[in-house]
Amino acid sequence: MKLVFYGAGNMAQAIFTGIINSNNLNANDIYLTNKSNEQALKSFAEKLGVNYSYDDEALLKDADYVFLGTKPHDFENLANRIREHITNDNRFISIMAGLSIDYIRQQLNTNNPLARIMPNTNAQVGHSVTGISFSNNFDPKSKNEVDELINAFGSVIEVSEEHLHQVTAITGSGPAFLYHVFEQYVKAGTELGLERNQVEESIRNLIIGTSKMIERSDLSMSQLRKNITSKGGTTQAGLDALSQYDIVSMFEDCLGAAVNRSMELSHKEDE
């Protein structure tokens, strides 16, 4: 299986590094290219043992999956460059935010199978939650192959294209939202009189430990919370204080704003 990556930014790097580390694919079957920084591309490709090239015809020849990972505003130039070299064997996977399947196909002048994926930065550690939407002509065998590729850097959830906006908000932007919550937790802990480095290190380990509990348990998060909450205890007192605030509405506003912005960007790019 030959994979080609157009764009070698942080997200693309996380994806193909995960694929290589999973041993699902030989590094020699992966080809990278970027817009212009050949020295950086060469250095990175040699470090991973993958191929790199600026020859679009050679890149697309016999390519099974072509990842489109350029910045959205650079895509039109890329499409102008590669459309004449597209073959019937090429299936496309876009990681470009805001560009619809119809728009990408129009720019590439092709009806080849195309999928849009929305990973998050946890792909760097093999734990992305990736939303995916397929064009109607993506056959079941190819879908399974794409799922296997994505599972190399996390988990996958298939949704309709219109619901990728919601996935973008919940899981795509999710790490940043959680980092922000943890930042506030550190600030509040520091206000109690402990040294900031002590609080930050403690909360880092708290997050890791809690994540492992969620991962290893069959219980819901609600039940896990109840299991460590004793009536009249310190945990109950803290939860009672939290219940005075409408946390659900806060997150609804947060996610709603992200969904709306995703839709705005999509309409803007597709114009």
Curated annotation (Swiss-Prot):
Keywords: Amino-acid biosynthesis, Cytoplasm, NADP, Oxidoreductase, Proline biosynthesis. Pathway: Amino-acid biosynthesis; L-proline biosynthesis; L-proline from L-glutamate 5-semialdehyde: step 1/1. It catalyses: L-proline + NADP(+) = (S)-1-pyrroline-5-carboxylate + NADPH + 2 H(+); L-proline + NAD(+) = (S)-1-pyrroline-5-carboxylate + NADH + 2 H(+). InterPro entries: 6-PGluconate_DH-like_C_sf, NAD(P)-bd_dom_sf, P5C_Rdtase_cat_N, P5CR_dimer, Pyrroline-COOH_reductase. Its EC number is 1.5.1.2. It holds the Pfam family F420_oxidored. SUPFAM superfamilies: 6-phosphogluconate dehydrogenase C-terminal domain-like (SSF48179), NAD(P)-binding Rossmann-fold domains (SSF51735). GO terms for biological process: L-proline biosynthetic process. It is found in: Cytoplasm. One of its GO terms (cellular component) is cytoplasm. One of its GO terms (molecular function) is pyrroline-5-carboxylate reductase activity. Its main location: cytoplasm. NCBIfam families: proC. Belongs to the pyrroline-5-carboxylate reductase family. Catalyzes the reduction of 1-pyrroline-5-carboxylate (PCA) to L-proline. This is Pyrroline-5-carboxylate reductase. The gene is proC.
